[in-house]
Amino acid sequence: MMGIQILPPQLANQIAAGEVVERPASVVKELVENSLDAGASRVDIEIDKGGSKLIKIRDNGSGIPKDELALALSRHATSKLHTLDDLEAILSFGFRGEALASISSVSRLTLTSRTADQTEAWQAHAEGADMAVKVMPAAHPVGSTIEVVDLFFNTPARRRFLKSDKTEFTHIDEWLKRIALVRGDIHLTLTHNGKTVRNYRPAMNEAQYLQRLTQVSGRPFAEQALKIECQHDDLRLSGYLQSPWSPVISDTHYFYVNGRLIRDRLVNHAVRQAFAQKAELEQPGYVLMLDIDPHQVDVNVHPAKHEVRFHQSRYVHDYILQALQSALEEAGELNFVHSSSLDEVEDVFVDAPTSATEISAPFVLGADSAQVNVPADTLESAQPLVASAVQVKSAGAGREGASFGTQTNAFGSMATPRDNSRGNYSAGESRQRTELPSKAAIASYGALLQTPSYSVKDQDYQPSLPMPAILDGQYWVMATADKLSLLPIKSVALATRCQEIEAKLATGLIGQPLLMPVSVAADADWQAVLDEHDTLIRQLGLELTIRYQQLIIKKVPPYIRESQLAKVIPEWLQSLRFETPAPSALAFWLAKHSLTGFVSAPEIWAAFSQLAEEKKQLIANKAILLPWQSWLEEQASE
C-alpha cells in the first residue's frame, strides 16, 4: 500500500471539490470507507445522540504509521493515488484526501492507529479549524479507531440544521445497509446510545449472503428475488432482481459500480424497460453490482461521489437491460421465447409438407437428411444468442435456471425518465421526462428487428403452380413432360434471397442496432479500410467504429443479424483489402449468412414463382435429372 503524502497542486486541482461533512451520516460514510480501503474485515460503529455527540469507528485494517498520522489530517493528503494516471483508474472508495481534514475542522477528532510493523500505537488529536495536530503514544491493536466528538461544535448554524437524533441515526442506518449489501465479506456492527442495533455477520457463502439480504431488504424480497450473474468481456453484472410475481412494493433500489454505491438514472431506466410488460410493478426492487474496467468509468464527476460517468453509457445501459431481460425470460416471466443458438447451424430449415397440397409440422433440413420436429411458435420467435452467460434462480426457493445466452436484438434509444427518488436534476431535465413505451410499441419495434422471412409483394398472391412434393426434406420433385428431376430447396432459397437482396442494395439496406455492440480486436489498417469503403459500408446498413484498438459493431443488416458477427465482419473487412465486391457478390454473401434460421418451403416456392421466367429457368437448371427411364428398363429386363 502506498504511503500517505500531500497531493501535487496540479492533481489536487483536478479532483472535484468534496461535499464531505453534510450530516453525521456523511462522517460515518467517509470513515467506514477509509476502513474498507485499509483492508479491514471488521468495522464497529458506535453512535451517540444520532452522531452529534459521538461517532466512533473501529477497524482491524492495516493502520497508519506514526509518521503519517499528522499528515493524514492534512487536506489533499491520501494514500489512494499520487498521479493523474491513478485518477483515471480508481478502485478505492476515497481518493481526494479531504475527509479527515474536513471532519476534524468541524469537530474534536482523535485518530488512534497501529500498523503490524509497529510495537506500539500512536494517537493524533485535532480540534476545530486551526487543525493543529498533537501526536502521542497510545494502546491499540493493529488497525485504527477514529472518534468524532461534538460534531459542528464550532459552526452553530450548521448544527441547528441537524434533524432529530432519531432522523440522523436513520440516515446512518440506511447508509450502512447499502454498504452491507456490496461488502458481504465484512463484519459490520452498529451501536446507538449503547444498544446494538445492527450486527451484519460476514457472508462467506450464498446462503449467508441471503441472510444479510433478508436483514437489509426484508424476507419478501429476499425469498423470491432472482439472482443475476452475467459476464461479457470486461463487464460483469451480479446481484438480485425483484421477482415480477412478487406483490410486495420494495424500496430496495441499490446500484453499485466497482463496489461504489451510486445514483444513476441509466440503471433505473434499464430496470423499468426490462419490466415494461409488467405494468403493475412501477419500480421493481434490485440490488445490482456492476464490475467494469476502471478506465471506462469516471468517478470524479460528482462532489459527493454519488454519480459516475461511463465512457460508453449506451453500451452499459443496453448490457444491463439485456441481462435483466434474459433473467426474466429464463424465469418464465416474459413472453419471449429463445431458440437454440442458430449461429452454428449451416443448413436451411423448412416446413415439410407430406404432399404437394398438405403441409405437415415444421422440420429441420439437416446435412444428414433427418427430419426433426420443431414447435411452430419457435419459428415465429427464434432469436439469436451471444456468448454472455446469465444464470438465474429464485433466491429463496433455490430455483436455478441453466446458463444461456442473451439476445442481440435491440430496443431503440429511448429517452430516460427522471427518477424522483434520485438526486436533484435541472429543470430542463425535469421537462424532458418521457414515459416508457407501451407494450404495443415495444412489440412493434421488436418486430422490426427480426431477421426477414421470405415475403411476397402481394400478400394474397397464390403461386400459379402448386408446390411440388418434397423428397427427404431437401428436394422438390419436379416433373415436366417425360423428365423427372430433384430441385434442391437450399439452392432455390439461396437464389431467391440473392435476388431479393440485390434489388434492395440499389437504395441501401437498413441497419438494425445491436442491443449489445460486438467488440473484436482491430488490425492496424482497419481504420483505413473503413475510411476507404465508407460508402459501401453504409450502403450495407453497417455501422462500424474503432475505439481503443477495438472494432465496435453497432449496426448490421437484418440478413446477418443471427450470424457470428465477431467472425463474419472481420473476415469481410479482410476481403475488402484486396477488392471491392460487386453487388451480386455482396448479395450472395448476405444471403448465405441469412439462411441459418427457419424458413418455410411454401414461402420459398412463392418467392420462386414470382421471379422472371429467365431467372426461374437459371435456378431450375440446377435440378438433378433422375434417370427414371433407364431404371425402369433395368427393372423390366430383370
From Swiss-Prot:
SMART domains given in the database record: DNA_mis_repair, MutL_C
Signal sequence coordinates: none
Gene3D superfamilies, alphabetized: 3.30.230.10, Histidine kinase-like ATPase, C-terminal domain, MutL, C-terminal domain, regulatory subdomain
UniProt record, GO biological process: mismatch repair
InterPro entries attached to this UniProt entry: DNA_mismatch_repair_CS, DNA_mismatch_repair_MutL, DNA_mismatch_S5_2-like, HATPase_C_sf, MutL/Mlh/PMS, MutL/Mlh/Pms-like, MutL_C, MutL_C_regsub
Molecular function GO labels: ATP binding; ATP hydrolysis activity; ATP-dependent DNA damage sensor activity; mismatched DNA binding
Entry keyword set: DNA damage, DNA repair
Protein name: DNA mismatch repair protein MutL
Native source species: Shewanella baltica (strain OS195)
Gene name of the record: mutL
